[in-house]
Amino acid sequence: MAKGQSLQDPFLNALRRERVPVSIYLVNGIKLQGQIESFDQFVILLKNTVSQMVYKHAISTVVPSRPVSHHSNNAGGGTSSNYHHGSSPQNTSAQQDSEETE
């Protein structure tokens, strides 16, 4: 589980530190918006007009409103080439399909 944390923690920490507005899509399709106030192994505290504790197992996707620079300590570099800024989870597969056909 430590390997999964090596990408997740720096990404969430950069979003928290830079106070980047995020959209969080839950597995049931609900979209939550706000800023990440804090997080731990199991939950993210999302602040908007109120603070909400969101369990990570209920999250499908975290979409920042702007690009963030996050660095991982792993040897692979830590950034994902599959990240499409500004795309919603519903549009991601359509974008990948169009990129493959070009």
UniProtKB/Swiss-Prot annotation:
The keyword Lipid biosynthesis does not apply. Residues 63-102 are annotated as: Disordered. GO terms for biological process: regulation of DNA-templated transcription; regulation of RNA stability; regulation of translation, ncRNA-mediated. Pfam families: Hfq. GO terms for cellular component: cytosol. RNA chaperone that binds small regulatory RNA (sRNAs) and mRNAs to facilitate mRNA translational regulation in response to envelope stress, environmental stress and changes in metabolite concentrations. Also binds with high specificity to tRNAs. The lineage of its organism: Bacteria, Pseudomonadati, Pseudomonadota, Gammaproteobacteria, Enterobacterales. Homohexamer. One of its GO terms (molecular function) is RNA binding. Residues 70-96 have a biased composition (Polar residues). Coiled coil: none annotated. The keyword Aminoacyl-tRNA synthetase does not apply. Keywords: RNA-binding, Stress response. Belongs to the Hfq family. This is RNA-binding protein Hfq. Residues 9-68 form the Sm domain.
